[in-house]
């Protein structure tokens, strides 16, 4: 047979056709950089909210469209700050403007964190519904920022019930710490068994996957801290060395990287071990670099290689 007689049929190509528009679209989709709409706080000094998530995700290879819910001089952990909470109407206008450009069609994920005013919840819910209308494959990852076991809640009293009753039910993924998971589910969360059970209880509220960003349980090995990921396919645990520091924004970075790793991995309903392992390795290296520098803020820029090629990997174990 001469070469002129060879025929093939590739993804919709007729036998004697040049590549079709559909085939070209497939190639373009393969090469497209994923886009993430990030609705969070912003600070001028330091790295929390969008000031943590945007650079991290961009360095990891994602397009990020930040929408700010507050515009503060610094995070509130300093005890003093200046700047406004962004009115919900203004946040809505920014998202509306993106949609009017036709760009919500290209959103692969929406992430949200610290909300500022209580009326931001409705804007986020509307944005998620609109983005999924434009692109049904888009996922929404919610970091239900409320507080932690040591300092308690650091948001206004009306935020936690709004997160629990309105925002979490529309999320595909949530990324609470143990304290936040306990509040959302109304359960005591202490050991591994109760943490997994609470994660599944949270899944019954709507999300498919849960990342517990910091697990401190009495039965863990001394000198370690853990992360837990749970979905309908199982539960996975990873331990990293415990570093004696707490820096605001580390949870924001973890939530952002986990969402990015899910987009590049096996989805939210499959094996979460790769996304969990990659996230834990990057966060540990970021905290290690920060600890060694003695900086009071995350060394987000200095540690940037960790978001792509972390030096150290940690074993991920299936525990459920």
Describe the residue ranges of each PLM region:
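Glycine-rich phosphate/adenosyl-contacting loop at the front of the ribokinase-like
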Residues: 3-86, 314-320
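Charged C-terminal helix
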Residues: 17, 23, 270-320
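Glycine-rich, highly charged phosphate/nucleotide-binding loops
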Residues: 83-100
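Membrane helix-loop-helix hairpins that form the core translocation module of multi-pass transporters
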Residues: 108-130, 139-148
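A short helix->loop->beta-strand "cap" motif at the edges of active sites that frequently abuts
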Residues: 131-139, 206-208
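Conserved phosphate/ATP/ADP-binding segment of small-molecule kinases
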Residues: 155-235, 245, 264-273
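Short glycine/threonine-rich catalytic loop with a Thr-x-Gly-x-Asp
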Residues: 241-258
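Short glycine/serine- and small hydrophobic-enriched flexible loop segments
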Residues: 256-264, 281, 285
């Amino acid at each position: 047979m001469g070469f002129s007689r060879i025929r093939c049929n590739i993804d919709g190509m007729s036998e004697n056709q040049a590549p079709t528009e559909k085939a070209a679209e497939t190639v373009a989709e393969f090469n497209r950089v994923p886009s993430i709409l990030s609705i969070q706080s912003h600070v001028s000094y330091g790295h929390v909210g969008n000031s943590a998530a945007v650079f991290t995700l961009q360095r990891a290879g994602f397009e990020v469209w930040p929408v700010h819910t507050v515009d503060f001089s610094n995070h509130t952990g300093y005890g003093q700050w200046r700047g406004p909470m962004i009115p919900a109407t203004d946040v809505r206008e920014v998202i509306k403007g993106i949609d009017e450009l036709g760009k919500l069609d290209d959103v692969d994920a929406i992430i949200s964190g610290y909300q500022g005013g209580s009326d931001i919840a409705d804007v986020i819910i509307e944005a998620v519904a609109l983005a999924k209308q434009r692109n049904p494959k888009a996922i929404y990852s919610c970091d239900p920022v409320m507080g932690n076991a040591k300092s308690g809640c650091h948001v206004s009293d009306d935020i936690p019930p709004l997160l629990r009753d309105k925002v979490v039910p529309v999320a595909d993924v949530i990324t609470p710490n143990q304290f936040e998971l306990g509040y959302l589910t109304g359960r005591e969360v202490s050991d591994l068994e109760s943490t997994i059970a609470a994660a599944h209880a949270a899944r019954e509220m709507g999300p498919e996957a849960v990342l517990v960003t910091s697990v401190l349980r009495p039965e863990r090995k001394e000198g370690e801290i853990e992360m837990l990921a749970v979905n309908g396919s199982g539960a996975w645990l990873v331990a990293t060395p415990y570093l004696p520091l707490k820096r605001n924004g580390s949870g924001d970075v973890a939530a952002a990287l986990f969402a990015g790793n899910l987009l590049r991995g096996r989805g939210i309903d499959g094996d979460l071990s790769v996304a969990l392992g990659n996230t834990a390795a990057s966060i540990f290296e970021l905290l290690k670099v920060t600890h060694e520098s003695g900086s009071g803020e995350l060394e987000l820029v200095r540690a940037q290689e960790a978001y792509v090629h972390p030096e150290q990997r940690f074993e991920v174990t299936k525990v459920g």
